[in-house]
């Protein structure tokens, strides 16, 4: 096996690993509000988007073309560069998952690839007009638009159901949430699975397996990416589901349906035009909007503000990881460089997973009362976030025997004759 084929295999495996992390990192985008409102049981709520993400991945390839051709010069791409970019995306995904921060997998991937490109060939390798028009501007506009649509939708829902018994409306909206959450999952598949397809497409172009003029990835790329994302989604990113469902605002079924419908509309629109949108930012914006639109709702703006900071540093920090990885792999070179880079990635992933086991979050405590700040899950240490079981009552005090008089301080008592 020659070195280039070896590198191609490593890139494909790493790309599918990124797609897997993207699946469990972004499960919360579709199902956090349904779980928080009680519309779906947690286990069912992660199985449904797994199937719909699989289907959605086959519905569009416009975003894949953007990743493959619209952000960096395909003629300057090497397999080392693509691998380093993927490492940047995976490491950032895992770190933010550990902290429970719903950051953008899309921007982590793009940041990693752009950083590796700059390290490899300099600024000239990046198509900056594409980065601005296809990534940065849509991210800002989509998050604000989702917040606005979510707020207006929630306000309209509560306005039109005013006077109807709350128990009756919540029962109806819980059923409606199954449909709206399914639509978000389908939309997520049409957008996020495409990004990994685009990366593998880019690697195949670099290797010479497909023409640089091709506009659609090979079928095996589409199928493998769809399956990897579906598998990751089924695992459920419980840490991020908890933050989205409980950390920003307490979600009721009407809010949940409005937020999910807003997310689906914005994501599907962006996928149609080929924008590499962050579905996480759209979902977060919709949840915030549902809190703003509900009269009397409490929005945790401190948590939201820290999320925005995480979004702002995603591109540059993932880019730094990508640039460092490229420098390391390229400096060592050959088979040793590729093997070392691959081994370091898996060692890092294992260390993060082991750290997460100190404060496990799963379907049993994902809906526990929110306490602390944005990284409450990590700070909980070895203790669970909350115990949902009712407290065990204390045993009753013993009943004194008949004719018993409790002794009093300073008074001597004598036994009866």
UniProtKB/Swiss-Prot annotation:
GO molecular function terms attached to this record: phosphate transmembrane transporter activity; symporter activity
Domain of life of the organism encoding this protein: Bacteria
Position of the signal peptide: none
Compositionally biased tracts (Pro residues): 390-404
Coiled coil: none
Region annotation (Disordered) ranges: 379-417
Record key words, sorted: Cell membrane, Membrane, Phosphate transport, Symport, Transmembrane, Transmembrane helix, Transport
GO cellular component assignments: plasma membrane
Record's keyword annotation contains NADP: no
Main subcellular localisation: membrane
Membrane topology, from the record: Multi-pass membrane protein
Bilayer-crossing regions: 5-25, 44-64, 81-101, 108-128, 135-155, 218-238, 327-347
Reactions this protein catalyses: phosphate(in) + H(+)(in) = phosphate(out) + H(+)(out)
Keyword Transmembrane helix: yes
Pfam family of the protein (one): PHO4
Compartmental location: Cell membrane
Biological process per Gene Ontology, one example term: phosphate ion transmembrane transport
Family under the similarity heading: Belongs to the inorganic phosphate transporter (PiT) (TC 2.A.20) family. Pit subfamily.
Miscellaneous field: Was identified as a high-confidence drug target.
PANTHER family linked: LOW-AFFINITY INORGANIC PHOSPHATE TRANSPORTER-RELATED, PHOSPHATE TRANSPORTER
Chain's role: Low-affinity inorganic phosphate transporter.
Protein name as it appears in the record: Probable low-affinity inorganic phosphate transporter
Organism field: Mycobacterium tuberculosis (strain ATCC 25618 / H37Rv)
